[in-house]
Design a protein with these regions (language model features):
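Generic structural signal for well-ordered alpha-helices
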Residues: 278-282, 320
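N-terminal secretory targeting modules
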Residues: 10, 17-152, 156-185
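Solvent-exposed loop/turn segments at secondary-structure junctions
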Residues: 70, 155-158, 206-211, 255-260, ...
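Histidine-centered active-site loop/cap adjacent to the catalytic His
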Residues: 185, 349-375
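Sec-dependent N-terminal signal peptides
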Residues: 4-13
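Conserved SGNH/GDSL esterase-like catalytic core that processes O-acyl groups on lipids
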Residues: 48-50, 124, 173-268, 272, ...
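Structural recognition of the beta-strand scaffold that forms the well-ordered cores
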Residues: 148-152, 157, 201-205, 247-252, ...
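Substrate-gating cap/lid alpha-helix
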Residues: 295-340, 351, 355-361
């Protein structure tokens, strides 16, 4: 009798699995927005904050297959926002092994807009998309937006620690360290602004990275050195084909070059190297995006108040204005300049913007971009 029951359970399990359906990553129902590695269409790889997989779905639920190329530590894992009809419905936690995550839609009679949005940055882990499993339902491709914006930036752009709010000393201590679970690039200023402008969003951002040197004074893996890659992560690299073709590129980098000035004695930032590297970087950007308008953004995380007498914000501003003036002479692209207000407390992790501060950054730059682009 026990053997008969076991056989029935096995057959039942087989029949249940056999009626399931699957859509491979190669299906044309998927829109891949941002930098994706489509070399293997059975396992699509991506790493940057804000990489999106979009489609439309009519049905009750589906399951999305994902895994991380990582050990799964607290700093080395991904989180994904699942957006249904413009609202975040759930958050999926990445795993080092393939896992299918159930996404409840409850839309049996009409198509819903679905977006899988990578909220953690490239430094956390490369993600792999394995496709979708479902029992019943229909899928359609979403139409592309008419506008495309590429954002190039640092920890501010990728939402470092923005899900917490910590008072400045003596009430609190924002020097908390990085935790992937507290990072959400969907609620960072670049993504917020792009949604308001109804533009496809592509993000190339790395915490701690600078123009010619990084926050820790190292010069490996600076933003200009990583820009031409679809992703990089612990020795895994893939060149990018520049297929996004943005109408607008917003560059908000350079703050981390001043990180060495927090040392005692301060390791001063080299103005000549800063300007030369920025111009060389713009040469690369304009070569691959000859028709894009470009905005050079400063501010946000630097002030003239600390460290005393270094005037870091004023120097940063003046150097980028030199870059802008020379760029107008050297490049045919239309180039603008924008300055964010300095952030105020409370802070996210390690003195970064909170959700409220990120919204303020978006509110500041959005009117400027509307005018700059005549949108």
């Amino acid at each position: 009798m026990a053997n008969i029951i076991s056989l029935i359970l096995i057959l039942s399990s087989f029949l249940s699995c056999s009626k399931g359906k699957e859509i491979k990553p190669s299906s044309d129902v998927f829109r891949y927005i941002g930098r994706f590695d489509l070399t293997n269409l059975e396992k699509v790889k991506f790493a940057h904050s804000g990489n999106q997989i979009e489609f439309r779905f009519k049905g009750i639920y589906f399951e999305i297959g994902l895994n991380d190329m990582s050990s799964g530590g607290a700093e080395d894992k991904n989180y994904f926002s699942i957006i249904i009809n413009g609202e975040v419905s759930q958050v999926v936690e990445g795993t080092p092994f393939l896992k299918y995550h159930k996404i409840l839609v409850n839309s049996p009679d009409s198509f819903s807009s679905i977006e899988i949005f990578k909220r953690t940055e490239a430094l956390c882990a490369v993600a792999i998309f394995h496709g979708i499993k479902f029992d019943e339902g229909e899928f359609k491709k979403k139409l592309a937006k008419k506008r495309r914006i590429e954002w190039i930036g640092d920890s501010f752009l990728v939402g470092y620690g923005n899900l917490v709010s910590i008072e400045a000393p003596p009430k609190g201590n924002p020097s908390s360290g990085f935790h992937a679970v507290n990072q959400n690039s969907y609620s960072a200023f670049g993504a917020i602004t792009s949604r308001f402008l109804d533009a496809d969003f592509s993000c190339i951002g790395f915490s701690g990275r600078g123009l010619y040197r990084n926050f820790d004074k190292s010069e490996n893996g600076t933003l200009p050195k990583e820009y031409s890659k679809a992703y990089f992560n612990k020795g895994v690299e893939k060149a990018y084909d520049f297929s996004f073709n943005p109408h607008l590129i917003v560059i908000a980098i350079g703050k981390n070059d001043f990180g060495g000035e927090l040392s005692k004695p301060p390791n001063m930032t080299d103005s000549i190297r800063f300007v030369k590297t920025y111009l060389k970087f713009l040469e690369l950007i304009t070569k691959n995006n000859p028709n894009a308008k470009i905005v050079l953004a400063v501010g946000g995380g630097l002030t003239d108040l600390t460290p005393r007498n270094l005037n870091r914000l004023s120097r940063f501003r003046s150097w980028v204005k030199v870059v802008k003036r020379l760029s107008d002479k050297y490049f045919s692209n239309t180039i603008g300049f924008f300055e964010f207000h300095s952030q105020e407390p409370p802070y996210g992790e390690d003195w970064h913007p909170t959700l409220i501060s990120q919204q303020k950054l978006a509110d500041q730059i959005t009117p400027y971009l509307l005018q700059f682009m005549d949108w």
